[in-house]
Structures are given as C-alpha cells and as structure tokens.
C-alpha cells in the first residue's frame, strides 16, 4: 500500500520541479532576448560608424588624388620651365648676310622724305634758319607804329551806344472790358541807367471783339416775374458766377 502513495508523491514533486524549471527557462529566455536587443543596437551603431568612416576616407582619398595631380602638373611645369632656358642657352646659328644688291633699296632709303624739302637734322643741333630768326639782324619796329597798330587793351570795356528801339506792337490778351488798355508802359532800361525806367508812348487801343462775358447781370434774372415756359423754372440751386 505504500507503493501507490509513494508514486503519487513522486508525480507531485516532478510537476513542481518541471514547473520550476519552466519558470527558470522563461526567465533565461527574457534575459537572452534583452541581450540580443543590446547586441543589435551595438551592431547598428557600428555599421553607422563604419559608413561614416568610409565616407571620410573617400574624401581624403579624393583630396590626395587632387594634390597628386597638382604636384604632377607643377612638376611638369617646372620641367618645362627648366627646359626652356636650356634651349635658350644654346646659341642660334648665325645666318650669313648676303651682300646688298645694287637694285635693292636699303632700309634707310625707305624712310619717307620730309614734306618741307629740307634735310632732317638731329634734334639737339639747332637749324641755321631758327638761329637766324633768333639773331637780331632786323631792327625792331618803331614804338609809334606799334602804338597805332596795337592799342593797349583798356581794363574796362567801352560802353556801346544803344540805338533807340522802335515801339513794338504788343499782343494784348482778350479780357473783360474793365481792364485798362491805354496808359504809359514802363520797361526797365539797360546799361548805365539800369535803375531808371524808360517810358514808351501809349499805343492806340486795338480793335477788340465784343466781350462774351457780361459785366452786369440782366435785370430779368433778379425779377420774380418770368415766362412760365422757362426751362430753368424750379431750379433753386442754380449758381451764377458774376465777374467782379
């Protein structure tokens, strides 16, 4: 009878042991999952750093290539500049000059002849013509002749006598009849008497057309009595401008 009881006790223990192991496995699984997430984060960070470093390395390689190209061009330029003086140092072979032929004109004869017909002279040597002019070969002109021919200019200019101006016909603008037309007209004078005005004789009044603007208002406008057929009847807001 102890056997079956012992068997039941064993099953319970096994169940408890298995349950304990299962909990431990679940806990380990969660721990490993957390470790896996951390490892993935580190891997992502490392991959980003790798791409960044590769880009920087590519930039440095491009700069190195450009500098190497510039060094190569500079070295080629230096080699060219060094080669040119060597070529210039070697003297060029001199050509033998052929004797000038009789018919061929010389370069000195190709120069244009002077327009005056006299031979050209050096600039430093004075010509005899100029020296003869500079010498006092001829007597000077008499002072009386010079005074008659060339009078000394006076500091003040002589005032010119103005001719009397003829009266001009003035164009008068057409205006109201109240404007005076006749009367003496004064104009400022010029010259010495600038302050004194010169008077002109009055001109006869020109023939003017009859004025279109009435200086006086007709009495019919002020009268109350009027024709019944007037087109302006009942218009109290009528404004009439009366010229003063």
Curated annotation (Swiss-Prot):
It comes from the Eukaryota. Residues 99-115 have a biased composition (Low complexity). Residues 63-236 are annotated as: Disordered. It is found in: Nucleus. Residues 202-212 have a biased composition (Pro residues). Residues 10-54 form a coiled coil. Signal peptide: none annotated. GO terms for biological process: chromatin remodeling; DNA recombination; DNA repair; positive regulation of DNA repair; positive regulation of DNA-templated transcription; positive regulation of telomere maintenance in response to DNA damage; regulation of cell cycle; regulation of chromosome organization. Putative regulatory component of the chromatin remodeling INO80 complex which is involved in transcriptional regulation, DNA replication and probably DNA repair. This is INO80 complex subunit E. The lineage of its organism: Eukaryota, Metazoa, Chordata, Craniata, Vertebrata. The gene is INO80E.
């Amino acid at each position: 009878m102890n056997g079956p009881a012992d068997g039941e006790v064993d099953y319970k223990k096994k169940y408890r042991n298995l349950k304990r192991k299962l909990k431990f496995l679940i806990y380990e699984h969660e721990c490993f999952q957390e470790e896996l997430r951390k490892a993935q984060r580190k891997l992502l960070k490392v991959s980003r750093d790798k791409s960044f470093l590769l880009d920087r390395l590519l930039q440095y390689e491009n700069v190195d290539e450009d500098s190497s190209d510039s060094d190569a061009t500079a070295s080629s330029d230096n080699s060219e500049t060094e080669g040119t003086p060597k070529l210039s140092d070697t003297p060029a072979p001199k050509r033998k000059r052929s004797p000038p032929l009789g018919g061929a004109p010389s370069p000195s004869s190709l120069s244009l002849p002077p327009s005056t017909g006299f031979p050209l002279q050096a600039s430093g040597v004075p010509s005899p013509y100029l020296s003869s002019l500079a010498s006092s070969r001829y007597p000077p002109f008499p002072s009386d002749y010079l005074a008659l021919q060339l009078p000394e200019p006076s500091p003040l200019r002589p005032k010119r006598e103005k001719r009397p101006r003829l009266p001009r016909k003035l164009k008068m603008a057409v205006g109201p009849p109240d404007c005076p037309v006749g009367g003496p007209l004064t104009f400022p004078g010029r010259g010495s008497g600038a302050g004194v005005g010169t008077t002109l004789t009055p001109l006869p009044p020109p023939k003017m057309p009859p004025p279109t603007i009435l200086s006086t208002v007709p009495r019919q406008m002020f009268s109350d009595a009027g024709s019944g057929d007037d087109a302006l009847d009942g218009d109290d807001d009528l404004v009439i401008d009366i010229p003063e």
